[in-house]
């Protein structure tokens, strides 16, 4: 009888240990999201109106901490909280106001509504 109880106790301890290891391994494999992730993306535009529109679109996404677009190199410099948004969220917001990015393009309908000086050469 002692052997049966001892064997069951050993089996219980072994199963408990394996379950804890499996749970701990899953936690380690999860990717920790950065609260201050920095990205630079190319956004088409021409003027100060474009700059204001692009930056406002980026800031409309919850989790964007900083958004600065430069006319000279057409780069949007971002700092985002990846726990609240993704880079794709920002690209979609920018495209929704008429400005193409590398991954998301504005619809023709929205692009045509841009002011004349804001229309850029589309790829």
Q: Where do the model's predicted regions map?
A:
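Sec/Tat-exported extracytoplasmic proteins
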Residues: 62-65, 97-103
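Helix N-cap motif at beta-to-alpha junctions
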Residues: 81-87
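Bacterial Sec-dependent N-terminal signal peptides
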Residues: 1-25
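Short acidic amphipathic segments
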Residues: 54-70
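Short amphipathic alpha-helices in soluble, non-transmembrane regions
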Residues: 54-56, 89-98
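Sec-dependent signal peptide cleavage junction
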Residues: 17-42, 88, 104-123
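Surface-exposed aromatic
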Residues: 71-79, 109-115
């Amino acid at each position: 009888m002692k052997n049966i109880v001892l064997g069951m106790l050993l089996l219980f301890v072994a199963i408990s240990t394996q379950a804890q290891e499996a749970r701990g391994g899953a936690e380690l494999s999860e990717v920790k999201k950065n609260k201050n992730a920095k990205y630079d993306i190319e956004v088409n535009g021409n003027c100060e109106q474009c700059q204001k529109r692009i930056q406002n679109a980026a800031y409309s996404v919850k989790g964007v901490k900083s958004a600065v677009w430069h006319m000279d190199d057409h780069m949007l410099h971002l700092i985002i909280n990846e726990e609240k948004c993704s880079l794709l969220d920002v690209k979609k917001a920018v495209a929704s106001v008429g400005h193409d990015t590398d991954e998301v393009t504005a619809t023709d309908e929205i692009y045509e509504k841009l002011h004349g000086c804001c229309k850029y050469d589309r790829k």
